[in-house]
């Protein structure tokens, strides 16, 4: 998993509350268990004018020019600004996969659905909770300033606006450690690989009848 330390990026404003996981990545694209291939279908029903299907050539599909991610000023955005209860609905890890592959490193909102919130950390995305007032002000500034960027410093737990104002956020210490060091569940397990090997050797020696090749 890619580590998250500090990031500066263009902000894309998704001014909708209660965005659910089926809107983030529609159900017809969930047939794959690979972590790649979902970026082109992020927010598929909003980005395109037709009905998306797996494995089609998205470059030939008609775009919804009114959708925020299709606006020229938000091309290359890596910070998503959203409203409350982002990521609600059914549990699907494909949602953070799609956001990550599109290029987003962080999502800022007043609140998140619990399962999506947890899945984001496990996949290298940083969900940041700010107050309604802070989020409202960010929406206003993004709208008024093309190319608006934020700098996110995970170690300092701070979001810095272009005008220099710093917005602080809270994060669980363990989740912070994992993101700073790029550790997903597998990475955490591999940190104890020596202890695991020692246990397996001891277990094999003490109960050899459990192993066919013993």
UniProtKB/Swiss-Prot annotation:
Protein's recorded name: 3-isopropylmalate dehydratase small subunit
Biological process annotations from GO: L-leucine biosynthetic process
Coiled coil (UniProt feature): none
A Pfam family reported for this protein in Swiss-Prot or TrEMBL: Aconitase_C
Matches recorded under SUPFAM superfamilies: LeuD/IlvD-like
Organism: Pseudomonas putida (strain ATCC 47054 / DSM 6125 / CFBP 8728 / NCIMB 11950 / KT2440)
Catalytic activity: (2R,3S)-3-isopropylmalate = (2S)-2-isopropylmalate
Gene Ontology annotations for the cellular component aspect, listed alphabetically: 3-isopropylmalate dehydratase complex
Source superkingdom: Bacteria
Gene: leuD
CDD domains, per the entry: IPMI_Swivel
Endpoints of the signal sequence: none
Function statement: Catalyzes the isomerization between 2-isopropylmalate and 3-isopropylmalate, via the formation of 2-isopropylmaleate.
EC number: 4.2.1.33
Known partners and oligomeric status: Heterodimer of LeuC and LeuD.
Keywords: Amino-acid biosynthesis, Branched-chain amino acid biosynthesis, Leucine biosynthesis, Lyase
Pathway noted in the entry: Amino-acid biosynthesis; L-leucine biosynthesis; L-leucine from 3-methyl-2-oxobutanoate: step 2/4
Family recorded in the similarity comment: Belongs to the LeuD family. LeuD type 1 subfamily.
Gene3D superfamilies: Aconitase, domain 4
A GO molecular-function annotation: 3-isopropylmalate dehydratase activity
């Amino acid at each position: 998993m890619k580590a998250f330390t500090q990031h500066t990026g263009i902000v894309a404003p998704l001014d909708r509350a209660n965005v659910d996981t089926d809107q983030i990545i529609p159900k017809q694209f969930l047939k794959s268990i690979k972590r790649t291939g979902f970026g082109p279908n992020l927010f598929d029903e909003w980005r395109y004018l037709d009905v998306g299907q797996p494995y089609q050539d998205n470059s030939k599909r008609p775009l919804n020019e009114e959708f925020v991610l299709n606006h020229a000023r938000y091309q290359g955005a890596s910070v998503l600004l959203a409203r409350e209860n982002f990521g609600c609905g059914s549990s699907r890890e494909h949602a953070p996969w799609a956001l990550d592959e599109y290029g987003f490193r962080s999502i800022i909102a007043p609140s998140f659905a619990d399962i999506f919130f947890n899945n984001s950390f496990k996949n290298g995305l940083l969900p940041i909770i700010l107050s309604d007032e802070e989020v409202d002000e960010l929406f206003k500034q993004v709208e008024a300033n093309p190319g608006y960027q934020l700098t996110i410093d995970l170690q300092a737990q701070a979001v810095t606006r272009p005008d220099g104002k710093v917005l602080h956020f809270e994060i669980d210490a363990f989740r912070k450690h994992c993101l700073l060091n790029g550790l997903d569940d597998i990475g955490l397990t591999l940190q104890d690989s020596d202890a695991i090997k020692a246990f397996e050797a001891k277990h094999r020696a003490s109960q050899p009848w459990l192993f066919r090749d013993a």
